[in-house]
């Protein structure tokens, strides 16, 4: 799932490189007006993404499906956890219509985890992609999926939908996975990514958050693990604490260190590497289809 981080909730003494300008520009203003008018559900707004203005200006937006309540309670994530609502079977059409209204050129679809459902929500996923393709044939797609508990028939539905990019985030290094992603497993995420590639997905992608107490060596090893799983694209960004109830930020990683990881990633053979303090899973997503 797309990492939901509120850029306004930061410890005192936050580094200057984490301060962002308010989004401006005609395209942003137009899209903001449409979102407000039609009450469209984008994770860009609900997650207070610091890159919203830039992405919207380039015709990219991220939509979250299957409700806004997750069955998992990851220590980093600002999405509500609990018992989700009944599946809205009209949601695929609603999302497709939102993309059409906003005239989105490249859409990223993500979701909460739905471990309460027999299909983990995978049927709604494929129906959403079909609806988007039908209503917006020129729009390219990235699906940022949960692990579906590694169940192959659920992953096969995503493969059958054939999005341009399929993403699944490992989020953190192996050692911290149990603390950061309580109900997920590091190796299962790698298996999911490896399976997607083996089944014919052209571009796979994963993301890592930094500042949770990981070491440089662990970050580099995680990047190696992703390459060994044939991942094409990696995003690396700064973890920001959504609220006081969530895991604290242990360290603010410098822009120079992010640049180092970017260079290392390119040397490892990733097709695209997005590495920087404000990078999120969907940052520059439209460029990842090239």
Curated annotation (Swiss-Prot):
Q: Give the gene that encodes this protein.
A: lipA
Per UniProt, [4Fe-4S] cluster 1 binds at 44, 49, 55, 282
Sequence ranges assigned to domain Radical SAM core in this UniProt record: 56-271
Which SUPFAM superfamilies does this UniProt record tie to the protein? Radical SAM enzymes (SSF102114)
**The entry's keywords:** 4Fe-4S, Cytoplasm, Iron, Iron-sulfur, Metal-binding, S-adenosyl-L-methionine, Transferase
Q: Where in the cell is it found?
A: Cytoplasm
Kindly list the cofactors needed: [4Fe-4S] cluster
Entry-linked InterPro entries: Aldolase_TIM, Elp3/MiaA/NifB-like_rSAM, Lipoyl_synth, rSAM
Q: PROSITE patterns given for it?
A: RADICAL_SAM
Q: SMART domains, alphabetically? A: Elp3
Where is [4Fe-4S] cluster 2 annotated to bind? 70, 74, 77
The protein, known as: Lipoyl synthase
Enzyme Commission designation: 2.8.1.8
Q: How is the cofactor bound?
A: Binds 2 [4Fe-4S] clusters per subunit. One cluster is coordinated with 3 cysteines and an exchangeable S-adenosyl-L-methionine.
Q: In which pathway does it act?
A: Protein modification; protein lipoylation via endogenous pathway; protein N(6)-(lipoyl)lysine from octanoyl-[acyl-carrier-protein]: step 2/2
Q: What class of enzyme is it?
A: transferase
Check the record and name the NCBIfam families matching this protein: lipA, PRK05481.1, PRK12928.1
Q: Can you name one GO molecular function term for this protein?
A: 4 iron, 4 sulfur cluster binding
């Amino acid at each position: 799932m797309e990492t939901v981080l509120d850029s306004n909730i930061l410890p005192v003494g936050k580094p200057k490189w984490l301060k962002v300008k308010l989004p401006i520009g005609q395209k942003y203003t137009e899209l903001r007006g449409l979102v407000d008018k039609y009450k469209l559900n984008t994770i860009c707004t609900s997650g207070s993404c610091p890159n919203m203005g830039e992405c919207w200006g380039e015709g990219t937006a991220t939509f979250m499906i299957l409700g806004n309540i997750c069955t998992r309670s990851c220590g980093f994530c600002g999405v509500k956890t609990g018992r989700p609502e009944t599946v809205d079977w009209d949601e695929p059409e609603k999302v497709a219509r939102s993309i059409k209204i906003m005239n989105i050129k490249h859409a990223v679809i993500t979701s909460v985890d739905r471990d309460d459902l027999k299909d983990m929500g995978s049927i709604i996923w494929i129906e959403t992609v079909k609806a988007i393709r039908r209503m917006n044939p020129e729009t390219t797609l990235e699906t940022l999926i949960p692990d579906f508990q590694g169940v192959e028939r659920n992953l096969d539905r995503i493969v059958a939908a054939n999005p341009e990019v399929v993403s699944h985030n490992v989020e953190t290094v192996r050692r911290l996975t149990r603390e950061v992603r309580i109900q997920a497993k590091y190796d299962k995420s790698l298996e999911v990514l490896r399976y997607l590639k083996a089944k014919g997905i052209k571009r796979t992608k994963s993301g890592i958050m930094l500042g949770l107490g990981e070491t440089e060596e662990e970050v580099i090893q995680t990047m190696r693990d992703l390459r060994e799983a044939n991942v094409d694209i990696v995003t690396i960004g700064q973890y920001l604490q959504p609220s006081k109830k969530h895991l604290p930020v242990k360290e603010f990683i410098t822009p120079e260190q992010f640049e180092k990881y970017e260079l290392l990633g390119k040397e490892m053979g990733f097709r695209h590497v997005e590495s920087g303090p404000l990078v999120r899973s969907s940052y520059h997503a439209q460029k990842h289809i090239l």
